């Protein structure tokens, strides 16, 4: 709602909402937990492939495509009538190609990677929705990641976990097993309220016929929502290579001032001097081999009990036997999917003295997820939505992000700034937009 959306409805692995074109741009740019934003262009019913073909062919495709552009179709199918999603995608492609061939004898090309127009068809039994994908590459690919360790945490999941805790930068945040630094980086972005889309080189809607460059420039270059962060985010790992990778990623995000990294095993974790929160994703033993996985979780429990008193710790894992080794009673259990793994995100309140006394003193700290525009959701969002920015570049040596206004396209390989040459300004057009769907993480 803070972004201006209306008619918000939470569904299964998706959220629908309505708004104008500006709302669509903002949804892509600001939402931390969305995987993609889809704009539905046709709803219909079909019981077989021929009916899908005819429905797609009836669309006035010159409004969205021309023969000089490429397109691709992604199909998501949950239906007894349609068992093969690839076959559905082929029928949609055939309908579009035949539409143009019959119109002018020419056809647009099909390109799987980075097409000019990306389409999505969703079928649930006989209910079909064809949408324009306004995001393109998955929104979890922020653009700051230079390298990754084995089995890195998805950026969208990391952001969702942080938002679930209610933390917004009120105290120090610690990830004692940070790997390539995803949780620390996402935490610093949340604390500073920096839009996750600021690192992206491109969104799919920038190739649309009605793309409003001036409008998107205004959205991109508006940093008025950013805020100061008076605490720190700490990321520790016992692997020197992981620390090196995390350092590169933090620097690429321009967050070296906010994020402090250190090579340190969890066994050496000591009681913080200031109020802190731990959010971490230890190894599960699924894709990462751990010689003594249960011993690792037992050690985690011991360090929390003896070196984190008076604070809260949130841990993501999927093995019950691992959680058992922690030896602490969780106050909150949140089911999450980390890829295909059914995990749980558990909160542990560490305290000194008697538990009853602690509960009395901390009544106001009971888990109450915040409801706001960046709240964690399942797997989608929908908007009904009305310029081109100079891509933002971060100089890691400066004091803060408020030191400049004009931002250039981010060079992923270094911190240099590239000259941005804006396109010609488009004339204002009156266009009617319908719903958008934003797919979000399985969490």
Regions found by a protein language model. Give the residues of each.
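Class I S-adenosyl-L-methionine
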Residues: 76, 101, 122-164
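Conserved S-adenosyl-L-methionine
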Residues: 153-270, 286, 294
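A short acidic, Gly/Pro-enriched loop at the edge of an enzyme's catalytic core
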Residues: 270-277
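Conserved small/polar residues in nucleotide/adenosyl-binding loops
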Residues: 434-441
């Amino acid at each position: 709602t803070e972004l201006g959306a209306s008619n918000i409805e939470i569904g299964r692995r998706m959220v629908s909402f309505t708004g104008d074109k500006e709302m669509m741009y903002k949804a892509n740019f600001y939402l931390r937990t969305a995987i993609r934003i889809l704009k539905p262009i046709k709803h219909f019913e079909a019981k077989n492939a021929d009916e899908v073909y005819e429905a797609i062919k009836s669309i006035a495709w010159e409004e969205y495509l021309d023969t000089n552009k490429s397109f691709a179709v992604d199909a998501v199918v949950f239906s007894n009538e349609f068992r093969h999603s690839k076959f559905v995608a082929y029928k949609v492609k055939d309908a579009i190609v035949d539409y143009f061939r019959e119109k002018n004898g020419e056809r647009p090309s099909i390109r799987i990677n980075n097409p000019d127009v990306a389409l999505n068809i969703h079928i649930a039994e006989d209910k079909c929705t064809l949408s324009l994908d306004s995001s393109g590459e998955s929104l979890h690919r922020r653009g700051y990641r230079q390298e990754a360790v084995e089995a890195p945490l998805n950026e969208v999941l990391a952001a969702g976990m942080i938002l679930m805790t209610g933390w917004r930068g009120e105290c120090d945040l610690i990830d004692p097993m940070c790997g390539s630094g995803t949780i620390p980086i996402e935490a610093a972005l949340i604390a500073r309220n920096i839009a996750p889309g600021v690192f992206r080189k491109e969104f799919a809607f920038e190739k649309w016929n009605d793309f409003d460059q001036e409008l998107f420039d205004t959205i991109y270059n508006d940093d008025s929502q950013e805020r100061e962060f008076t605490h720190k985010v700490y990321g520790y790992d016992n692997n020197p290579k992981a620390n090196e990778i995390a350092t590169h990623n933090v620097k690429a995000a321009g967050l070296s001032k906010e994020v402090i990294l250190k090579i340190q095993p969890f066994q050496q974790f000591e009681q913080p001097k200031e109020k802190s929160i731990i959010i971490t994703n230890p190894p599960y033993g699924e894709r990462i081999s751990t010689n003594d996985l249960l011993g690792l979780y037992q050690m985690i429990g011991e360090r929390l009990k003896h070196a984190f008193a008076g604070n809260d710790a949130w841990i993501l894992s999927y093995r019950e036997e691992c959680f058992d080794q922690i030896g602490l009673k969780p106050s909150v259990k949140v089911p999450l999917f980390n890829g295909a793994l059914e995990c749980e995100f558990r909160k542990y309140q560490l305290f000194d003295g008697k538990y009853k006394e602690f509960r009395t003193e901390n009544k106001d700290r009971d888990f109450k997820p915040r409801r706001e525009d960046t709240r964690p959701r399942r797997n989608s969002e929908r908007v009904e939505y009305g310029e081109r920015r100079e891509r933002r570049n971060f100089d890691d040596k400066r004091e803060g992000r408020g030191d400049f206004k004009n931002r250039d396209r981010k060079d992923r390989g270094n911190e240099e700034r590239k000259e941005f040459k804006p396109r010609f300004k488009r004339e204002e057009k009156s266009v009617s937009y319908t719903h958008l769907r934003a797919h979000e993480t399985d969490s």
